[in-house]
Amino acid sequence: YIHDMKLTQQFAMLNRKAMVDVIMTGMGFTAVETFTTIHNYIDTDAMILRKGSVSAKAGEKLLIPINMRDGSLICSGKDWNCSAPHGAGRLMSRKAAFNALSMEEFQKEMEGIYTTCVVPDTLDESPMAYKSMEEIVAQIGPTAEIIERIRPVYNFKAAD
């Protein structure tokens, strides 16, 4: 099982790299620095199962995504249990989001960010379904130091 899981995690890492390469090439960008942050995996070197967290060893660079509108936090790990939260966390389940949120509000919240993905199939990924940036910033202090907040100019979410 562990062997197959390692192969799957390696495949996922290479797949993410391929997606980044396609986007960077298509937009004519050149990467200055890259790093990878993954969540919901087994760190076989440290034998830590991370569900809802990411590796945050002392000085390790990591990304904490917030939502489609607010962007992400680039952070440096503080070695608090070698982990930090992997994202903002949901305020509501996917089903509850589909039932409670409106496309009109979703469209309004995403104004100013280029995306073709503000569609009914991604309503459960709308900013309103997640905790706020302010709440996350207030809570992550023991786990990670915020280096920079990055804001989206382009957002893509795959739908079924």
Where are these regions (language model features)?
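Domain-length cofactor-binding catalytic modules of enzymes
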Residues: 1-160
